[in-house]
Design a protein with these regions (language model features):
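Long, C-terminal-biased catalytic regions of enzyme "large/alpha" subunits
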Residues: 1-98
Length: 98
């Protein structure tokens, strides 16, 4: 996980617009925790699964920063997470996440 955090922390600060209109600093840990929470419910989280989750988180964060450098709405983050899970054929994980 250290490599993931090091790579992600080099990205510029991004703000997230919440459903109630508040703007907060983007926190990659929230995505990571949500993916792990969903994974815990549908599979054994082995070191291999942990590696896949880290790779997914990295792809999700990269996509968010590339598409929304000026700020992102919370529903856009959710759409990207769902899309990346489906692209990775992580159907059970996607269903639990949704």
């Amino acid at each position: 996980m250290i490599a993931l955090e090091e790579k992600i922390t080099t990205l510029p600060t991004l703000f997230v617009e919440k459903r109630d209109g508040r703007r907060v600093v983007f926190d990659v840990d929230k995505i990571d925790k949500a993916l792990h929470k969903a994974a815990d419910k549908v599979m054994d989280v082995t070191p291999l699964v942990e590696k896949r989750l880290n790779a997914l988180t990295e792809r999700i964060v990269t996509e968010i920063h590339s598409r929304f450098p000026q700020g992102v709405k919370i529903y856009e983050i959710q759409n990207i997470v769902e899309h990346e899970l489906l692209e990775a054929k992580e159907y059970a994980l996607a269903e639990e996440y949704i």
